[in-house]
Amino acid sequence: MNILIRIGTLLCLGCVAIGTTFSQPNYQIDVSGVKYPIRKGHLDLGGKSITGESIEVNSFYIERNGEPYFPVMGEFHYNRYPNQYWDEEIKKMKAGGISVVATYVFWNMHEHKEGTFNWEGDLNLRRFIELCQANNMDAIIRVGPFDHGEMRNGGLPDWLYGRPFEVRSNDSLYLDYVNKLYNQIGKQIQGLYFKDSGPVVGIQIENEYQHSAAPWAITYEGADREYTSARFDRKIIKAGVGINEMGNDYAEYGQKHMQILKKMAKDAGMDVPIYTATGWGYASIVKNGSIPVMAGYAYPFWEAGNKPSPFYLYKSIHQNPDYAPVSYTPEDYPSLAAELGTGMCVTYSRRPRVLGKSFLPMMIRTVGSGSNGLGYYMYHGGTTPSDGFYMYSEGFGLNLKSYDYQAPIGEFGNAGDGFYHLKLINAFLRHYGPILAPLIPVIPETNAGIQPEDTTTLRYSVRSDGTKGFLFMHNFQDHISSPDLKNLQIKVKTREGIISFPENGTLTLKSGASVVLPFNMKFSNIAFKYATVQPLCAFTNSGIKYSVFFSIDGMVPEIALRDMVKVNTIGAKTLLRNGSPVITGNHGFTFEFEVDDNHFLIIPFEDALHAYLVGNPGDQNLIISDVLVLENDQKLELIINGKESWNLRIYPKVKNIESSEVKILSEKPRMRFFSAFQLSLDKIIPDINLTQYDDRHFVLDARKFDFSKVNDVFVNFDYRGDRAVCMLNGELATDNLYTGKPWQIGLKRYAKELKNNDMYFYFLPMRNDAPYLGYLDKEVLPDFSKNREFLEINNPEVIPEYKISIKIKRD
């Protein structure tokens, strides 16, 4: 029966995905016959809480309280960040649109010495999960025993090395040790599970089992590497995420192992509605008892070279997962990702530079291909702990301390470009994920012939139920540049007729751009025929419904309504087309229209990057500002980096904002439906001396500075060289392998030690025969014609970061 359903599904999708390229760049796709069977009740997953909430899992998506649910997961390792700042960092993740915090429990940190467990300080898992709960964030805990995460031995303790059993096997001696670990974890999070109305909705069992392993740290120069896997798995084990075309002679053994681990986890108290297992590259999962989560790394350090990846090409990801073949039947499970590479670590010889602008197109592609859950690895960087010069880092060329990962939020809590770009898809999924999740992906025939190097054929897909849906497009490819795609028109054939994007004329999809466009959808109960603006969020304020969209450069903002209704516009114009209103505006400008007391706001792309929805349901506002906006109970916390004056706009308009910490000047807004303010504070010049001793050494003295005056202080080194290290109190504090980006170090976590100690920075020159030169952008490569070594350090900066609180007065 299952085989017949699966074959029927493939035939159906083949019939409906009719894409034709005309003589001009026009594209057509037929979704009118879309059909896809969704199975329920076959998975040993799901559960209820003591308050009656429920989570269920079918073959296509997760349901929460009976409604489709689209989780957005961000990885943040509590053990790689100072615990006194966890709360602020979780708030940043929430502001970025994350709904589920994922984290690893690294066994070797918690049981460094056999039989002695440590759950204190930065290893206080319980406190971390409690802070997730306090911020209304769910959590998925990746409990190992093996994790990887570029950790020493992949998280396995050193003392397991050489024991008379195979690690990651069904040997009873090994499983006894794992059972002790699981029981410890279970006790730490007792009462915090979903069933208790707690935040822990999921547990990941093992990691990349029968797919990947880490090198044992106990080794010798010149010796073959030994890996943290059972010997019988060695021939299929990889150093990183990849494709296994060999199959697995021990697949049945692996499934048994995963079943044993799940039972042990449940017996230890880890009873949750969602169990996951990494499913890529033929890894073993718990058959029908776990969701096989997926990955996508476009810039992997474990593979040599700069080859364009397939992770920007649309596909039916539910039937054909990335890194296929897999060990399970994909159609039996929803497609969820755990490790979409929002960043990448580097090694001494391989240094992939990952741009924040690469994150959003990958997510648009992944969601448009049928994924019903996103998971970012890493979303928040950190610093790998050490004990003196005992390093917990995996080593073997990786950073010894820094785990910045080029992530959306970096090693020291600094938000980068990727943070702001991902906010757009995260906000869309938060508000429209329940509508999107049941919609079926339809892939055009033109996609079948696209190779990563083809940057002239439009990359697009549709998710639809045959009538309504969303058009997904992007124009990005890793490692190569993409030209603007001009004079495009995309036709979507639905059961109610053909929808053209746009109806008249054409559009341009600029290089690097990505977009999600709706058709035959209702927003605030107003029927849209189509729109060339992307939905961002929807909310209610004082009983009035608001929907917010943003425009994309290269596309005339156009909203075609389906019915003849009265439209009031501000900053836009309305025309009649085929008897229905069409609202048009200009890209780069804000405009609003109103239908039946429902308000629709269209803002430029740049404003959307810096937009935050704040407040309680029913009483919310949109804030636009280029500072970071966090919610803290009834207050807003603003984090301001390196400036003392900034602007803030609020929609819909409010009476005022209040703060005892800053000067507030009310401004006349450009659009009358906004409130606008200018905020300023007194400049603080940190009493910190940074002295250059020679061409390689800097010494920082912060003994006189009171760190309580600021939220943080960043030292910024704009340098070109091989690498740099930061030493404090005789130990390595952090390090940097040069990738072309400035090196930023936050000082607040070191404030106590800096009261009595200098901080030392040591830089080494780049050589003309360095193995990583091919990874660096041409603009940063030095001229080696006169010297075989090069080191350049521009004037370093000491930059204060402020945090202030404000309160919105709505009445």
Q: Could you describe each region identified by the protein language model?
A:
Residues M1-P25:
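Bacterial Sec-dependent N-terminal signal peptides
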Residues Q24-V100, I804:
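N-terminal carbohydrate-binding accessory modules
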Residues G41-H42, G46-G47, S54-E56, R64, ...:
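Extended carbohydrate-recognition surfaces in non-catalytic/accessory domains of CAZymes
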Residues N65, N578, M727-A733:
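Short strand-turn-strand beta-turns centered on an Asx-Gly dipeptide
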Residues W86-G154, D158-W159, K262, K266:
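Aromatic-lined substrate-binding rim segments of carbohydrate-active enzymes
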Residues A134-I140, P145-F311, Y323-C345, S371:
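Active-site region of glycoside hydrolase catalytic domains
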Residues R163, Y174-Q188, D196-I205, Y209-H211, ...:
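Carbohydrate-binding surfaces of carbohydrate-active enzymes
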Residues D706-L728, F761-F763:
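Aromatic-lined ligand-binding clefts that engage carbohydrates, nucleic acids, or primary amines
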